From Swiss-Prot:
Pfam families: SpoVG. One of its GO terms (biological process) is division septum assembly. Could be involved in septation. The gene is spoVG2. Belongs to the SpoVG family. It comes from the Bacteria. PANTHER family: SEPTATION PROTEIN SPOVG-RELATED. This is Putative septation protein SpoVG 2. Keywords: Cell cycle, Cell division, Septation.
Length: 102
């Protein structure tokens, strides 16, 4: 199984969620609502979940083994970092343009 596409949207919240992602597997299957969470030990990926009638959250879709979970986390967090670098570059370019316009 290969993750063939990652779409990520950073979010600004008061909580620990930093982004929401969708991944495409083998160009055939999409999983939406994967969350990037800023946990006590750094960033991690939380699979889409739904609150049951008992109040507990249950994953809607999740990897069967730890290798697959690690692969998904690796590509999603890499995209998170890439998007962050692009945003930082865009802000730096805007600041440079406003300084040169003065």
């Amino acid at each position: 199984m290969q993750v063939t596409d990652v779409r990520l949207r950073r979010v600004e919240t008061d909580g620990r969620m930093r982004a929401i992602a969708s991944i495409t597997l083998d160009e055939e299957f999409v999983v939406h609502d994967i969350r990037v969470i800023d946990g006590n030990n750094g960033l991690f990926v939380a699979m889409p979940s739904k609150r049951g009638v008992d109040g507990e959250f249950r994953d809607i879709a999740h990897p069967i083994n730890s290798d697959t979970r690690a692969k998904i986390q690796e590509v999603v967090l890499a995209e998170y970092e890439r998007v962050g670098e692009e945003e930082a570059t865009a802000v730096t370019e805007e600041e440079s343009e406003s300084v040169s316009a003065e």
